């Protein structure tokens, strides 16, 4: 298999060779855009109201039925997934795993916002789609949950312009060491939550048996550190390479 750096260079070449390719994107009228935004705002508000007291209703039969209906409607409306083309049995598995992920997320952190859950859930869906493409049975375990949940915790912290660079640097240094297997307790909720998620991955994929899993996670972290530097001082070539590096490492981890 090609090295990761070779794959990054190959993707860069492919991107440059596609510059003259015309995308067949249908224009969306302003009125339709406005209507779509309105629907998105209403959908988000509706879900937030529904999830507000979710922790107290997870075992309630009526709540579970309503959750089934909502998740199924969400899957069917998601244009990227193209859910309707999946076989009925696969649709059922998709639905079951999505519901379980939402329950797990709410149990893990009752303070999670809907945006955070959706951000992590998209990664779960990507993993499930990869399994479909590889014609494998869909599976869900705590490492998939934990890896997906790392995104809202780490990305949102590092992308927050209100947090100074020094705090981000300290966190990145700690996370890099944690992904290498170092245990250095920190007295802050963010660190404890991320540490718990990494521990879940370690429980499912022991380091000695699955070194490639942690190599991929470290690649993502390296890309994240580089992306913090992604500002006006970087040229287009550097920005493109960082984007390919980070995105490629994420898909590689999904595959593992």
Predicted regions and their residues:
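All-alpha helical catalytic cores of prenyl diphosphate-utilizing isoprenoid enzymes
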Residues: 85-150, 156-172, 178-256
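Acidic, metal/ion-handling microdomains and their immediate structural contexts
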Residues: 1-96, 129-180, 256
